[in-house]
Amino acid sequence: MTNKQINTFFSLSLAGILALVFSTGIKESTAAAFRIEGHNMIVDQAGRILTIDKPFKRIISLYGAHTENLFNLGLDNEIIGVSRHETYPPQALQKSVFSYREDPEKFLAVRPDLVIIRPMIDRGYPQFVSMLEKNGIKVISLQPGNIEDMYTYWEILGILSGKQQQALKMVSRFKAAVSDFKSLTDAQAAKKRVYFEAIHNKMKTFTPDSMAIFALETAGGINIATDAEPVRNTNIAYYGKERILSRSREIDVYLAQSGAMNKPTVKLITNEPGFKTIKAVADRQIYTIDEQIVSRPTMRLLDGIYQIGTILYPEDFNEKSLEILNGAKNPLWNE
C-alpha cells in the first residue's frame, strides 16, 4: 500500500469515526429506518436496496445478535463466519472468526455471498464495506432499537436466509409470550418502581422506548426515569446522580445491567456516595442482570423479562412463567 493510499484509508476511517462520535438527534437504530418492500426487496439502514431472488448460503455475521437470530431460525452450515465477540449459542463458538478491522482479503478468501453488519461498521469503516461490495459481496446493515423494529428485523433475516415462515413464527411466539407475561401481574395493585442502570460511572439509564425498558415494563415494573434524555444515536439515556437521589424514596428496586459496558456489583452500588438514601439500597433490593438478555434484539429478551419478573414479583413469576418461557423457546423447526 502506498503512502497516498494509507493516508486516504486513515482519512476515510477518521471521517467515519467522527461521524459516529458527533452525529446527534435520532437514535442509531432509526437514523435511516430499514424496511421490507414487496415480498423480496429490503432497504437497510444505510439506504441500500437488496432484491432477494434466492436465499443466501454463505453468510458472515459481524454482530452477535445477527448470529444468534440466524441460528434460532435454523441455520448452521450457511453461517460460515462470525464476529470476535460471540457467546451464544454454543455452536457460534465453533465458527471461523472475522473482524471488520482485518484485511478484507480474509473475507474474500472464503467467498461469502452476504455479510451482515450494523450501522457503526458502515460509518466507522466505509473503506472495508466498499471493498466487500466492489468484489461482489452483498452487505446489509441492520440494528433495531425498539421492539417494533425488532419484529421487522427478524422478518428481514428470514427473507435473507429463506426462513420467512420461521421468522414469522418467532414474531408470533414472542408477542404471545409477552402477552402471557403481562397477564401474570395484572392483579398487582402496587407495581414496583425501578431505576434501571445502564452505565454506573456515568449515571446513565435507558431511553423509555429501549428494549431494556420494554423488558422491565413487560415484567410489571414501573420505570422511574421516563424523563431521561437520550445520548446521541443510542438507547442509553442521561440521568445523573442528582435526579436519581431526588427520587430516592420512589425507587423500590435498583436494577443494573451487567456486561462489557457496565460491570456493577451490589457493593459498588451500595457504597456509591449518597446512595444509602435510596429506598432500594436501604431495603437491599439491588440486582444485576446480563445485558445480553435485556439489550439485544433476540428471543432471549424473554429470558430477561422472566428474570426481572422473578426479582420483582416472585410470587407471580412461578411455574406458569417458566412454562411461558420454555414454550416460546422451543425450536422453530419442530412445528
Which ranges hold each PLM region?
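Bacterial N-terminal signal peptides
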Residues: 11-23
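Structured C-terminal subdomain patch of bacterial secreted/periplasmic proteins
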Residues: 34-36, 58, 147-159, 168, ...
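A short, structured surface patch at a secondary-structure boundary
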Residues: 58-110, 114-123, 224
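Flexible loop/hinge segments that line or gate small-molecule binding clefts
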Residues: 85-87, 122, 129-156, 160
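Bacterial N-terminal signal peptides that target proteins for export
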Residues: 2-14
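Basic- and aromatic-lined ligand-binding clefts that recognize polyanionic substrates
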Residues: 58-70, 166-219, 226, 234, ...
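Proline-aspartate-enriched helix->loop->beta-strand connector
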Residues: 99, 103-120, 137, 240-258
